[in-house]
Amino acid sequence: MHPPTDLPRWVYLPAIAGIVFVAMPLVAIAIRVDWPRFWALITTPSSQTALLLSVKTAAASTVLCVLLGVPMALVLARSRGRLVRSLRPLILLPLVLPPVVGGIALLYAFGRLGLIGRYLEAAGISIAFSTAAVVLAQTFVSLPYLVISLEGAARTAGADYEVVAATLGARPGTVWWRVTLPLLLPGVVSGSVLAFARSLGEFGATLTFAGSRQGVTRTLPLEIYLQRVTDPDAAVALSLLLVVVAALVVLGVGARTPIGTDTR
């Protein structure tokens, strides 16, 4: 590969302005934190309950994203049918939908009178405004992140090896477990981390579809929203906690995908 050419100097000015624009609000949060009380603010019973619920539901939604997203990414990447190509925008739509719209859509799908929810309700299964609703809301908004991060790798990774394995007599299931999945594993890990981070910070769809019941559906973003009115210092401290978690996630993903690495 040829080394990149030097950029014009004027390019650095808007680049620096963009960096400052992104960094300034984060720095403002750190400055605003009541540091002597920081640990006490993030370890109150309500904060701990919300954090634990967020981690549990984000982990559950990440598992769902992997179970659903890996096959979806493979189908999108490998299938050449028109139907699959036409479904791609639909699958990625939650990326651009306002989260509150996603929450309303889930409510009318899985709510008591929803398209599917009415039958579940008749069977004694209630999803809306429960912990399961939190998991579904997080999965709805996070699934496209895993799919889109894995689709590119699924399109090229291991195709030649799969053909060789098949010509040697390996069954499709064996090819999947022994060839395809190991080659996709780095992408699955990166996509899972992104999905977990997105689930951890989900707010709008959760509030609309699951509500804000303490210990049941009140995740950390909802706790921050409520504390913003009753205890602004606690809201700032919890916000910084989420910023740190998100930063660790971004650094972790960046460490797994070094710049200039050829992933083919």
UniProtKB/Swiss-Prot annotation:
CDD domains: TM_PBP2. Part of the binding-protein-dependent transport system ModABCD for molybdenum; probably responsible for the translocation of the substrate across the membrane. The keyword rRNA processing does not apply. PROSITE patterns: ABC_TM1 (PS50928). This is Molybdenum transport system permease protein ModB. One of its GO terms (cellular component) is plasma membrane. Belongs to the binding-protein-dependent transport system permease family. CysTW subfamily. InterPro entries: MetI-like (IPR000515), MetI-like_sf (IPR035906), ModB_ABC (IPR011867), NifC_ABC_porter (IPR006469). The chain crosses the membrane at residues 11-31, 57-77, 90-110, 127-147, 176-196, 234-254. One of its GO terms (molecular function) is molybdate ion transmembrane transporter activity. The gene is modB. Pfam families: BPD_transp_1. Keywords: Cell membrane, Membrane, Molybdenum, Transmembrane, Transmembrane helix, Transport. It is found in: Cell membrane. Coiled coil: none annotated. Residues 51-253 form the ABC transmembrane type-1 domain. It is a multi-pass membrane protein. It comes from Mycobacterium tuberculosis (strain ATCC 25618 / H37Rv).
